[in-house]
Amino acid sequence: MKPKRVQGKIVIEFPSEDIAEVVYTSVLYEHVSVPYRRSRVNFRREGRRIVLEIEANDSSAMRGTVNSYLRWIKVALDVLNI
């Protein structure tokens, strides 16, 4: 029996649209350039929010995808705070 795909949604709200835009733009390059074979991500900005909708083949792929995006977002925020 083939395992079901795993789905999840993450919404991160920032203090301002400007910060959300900078973080979104920073992470967008990674989103476009890194090929994922085991997951699909709908990555977008909605005002002050960044939205990730993830569909993965299994829980390991989901975990890896979530970890990558959250790490990229954290790095972008850390750079903003320098």
Swiss-Prot record:
Signal peptide: none annotated. GO terms for biological process: tRNA threonylcarbamoyladenosine modification. It comes from the Archaea. The keyword Cytoplasm applies. GO terms for cellular component: cytoplasm; EKC/KEOPS complex. It holds the Pfam family Pcc1. The keyword tRNA processing applies. Transmembrane segments: none annotated. Its main location: cytoplasm. Gene3D superfamilies: Alpha-D-phosphohexomutase, C-terminal domain. Keywords: Cytoplasm, tRNA processing. It is found in: Cytoplasm. Component of the KEOPS complex that consists of Kae1, Bud32, Cgi121 and Pcc1; the whole complex dimerizes. NCBIfam families: KEOPS_Pcc1, PRK14887.1. Component of the KEOPS complex that is required for the formation of a threonylcarbamoyl group on adenosine at position 37 (t(6)A37) in tRNAs that read codons beginning with adenine. The complex is probably involved in the transfer of the threonylcarbamoyl moiety of threonylcarbamoyl-AMP (TC-AMP) to the N6 group of A37. Pcc1 functions as a dimerization module for the complex. Belongs to the CTAG/PCC1 family. This is KEOPS complex subunit Pcc1. It comes from Pyrococcus abyssi (strain GE5 / Orsay).
